[in-house]
């Protein structure tokens, strides 16, 4: 999962959500982390993972982007192998394969056998699965996720831009109540302003004439941390300067166009 170029400061105003996610991970409770684009869903997960002990982090299997049922199943098996799962290693060795040709071994297996290995390997309840930018989730993948959650005893942490069927597909049935949801909305006013000041320093914008820049940025970003960071990063580029002023209208249009490109089915948004 890709991390933002602004480090821990991007988590300003998200401390409560981070605690909630840590608690859910400790309790092995599946969660939907939902909110608009650039609300910080990817960064929240990355920050939480970075704070886990190394042993626990190795057993967190992460996927980003769209996937078919088969692709997701193969990725989980691959994740179990690299997490050092003894059963998966035993199966690979028994078929006279190694890490060097693991992909070929996985490709040769039927979906039925891969599911059997997955369920047996995870029955001790040691792993966690994080899925970013997968939505909307098809019925077939939802059925696999339900098997992973209920049969394989493995919690699934999913990101989405909403919590309804229209936004995350059939997966809504896994996260049907607020108990299984973490909502990331706009940041509080004071936190958003603090992040703006940090980004101004980080991207060297304090040498520009920022009259009106802060208020325009807060308004156009909707107090979303990813929007603040990305627009400040763009503001550092000379093409958005008119003398020592920032051309906010052009910058905002380009930021929106970037967002549309990154949210297309073939790319990974942040």
Q: Language-model segments: what does each one mean?
A:
Residues 2-5, 69-98:
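Conserved NTP-binding/hydrolysis module of P-loop NTPases
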Residues 35, 130-174, 178:
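Sensor-1/coupling segment of RecA-like P-loop NTPase cores
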Residues 32, 44, 128, 185, ...:
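C-terminal alpha-helical "lid" subdomain
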């Amino acid at each position: 999962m890709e991390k933002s170029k602004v480090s821990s400061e991007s988590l300003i105003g998200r401390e409560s959500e981070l605690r909630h996610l840590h608690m859910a991970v400790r309790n092995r409770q599946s969660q939907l982390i939902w909110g608009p684009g650039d609300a910080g869903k990817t960064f929240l997960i990355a920050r939480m993972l970075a704070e886990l002990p190394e042993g626990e982090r190795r057993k967190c299997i992460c996927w980003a982007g769209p996937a078919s049922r088969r692709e997701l199943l193969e990725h989980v098996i691959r994740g179990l192998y690299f997490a050092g799962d003894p059963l998966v290693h035993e199966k690979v060795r028994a078929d006279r394969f190694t890490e060097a040709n693991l992909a070929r071994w996985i490709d040769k297996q039927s979906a039925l056998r891969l599911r059997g290995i997955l369920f047996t390997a995870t029955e001790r309840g040691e792993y966690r699965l994080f899925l970013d930018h997968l939505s909307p989730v098809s019925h077939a993948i939802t059925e696999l996720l339900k098997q992973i959650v209920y049969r394989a005893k493995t919690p699934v942490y999913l990101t989405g831009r909403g919590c309804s069927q229209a936004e995350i597909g059939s997966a809504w049935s896994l996260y049907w109540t607020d108990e299984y949801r973490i909502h990331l909305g706009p940041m509080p006013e004071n936190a958003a302003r603090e992040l703006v000041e940090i980004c101004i320093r980080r991207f060297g914008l304090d040498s520009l004439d920022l009259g009106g820049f802060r208020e325009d940025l807060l308004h156009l970003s909707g107090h979303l941390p990813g929007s603040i960071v990305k627009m400040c990063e763009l503001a550092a580029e000379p093409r958005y300067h008119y003398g020592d002023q920032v051309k906010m209208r052009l910058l905002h249009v380009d930021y929106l166009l970037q967002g549309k490109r990154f949210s297309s089915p073939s790319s990974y948004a942040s």
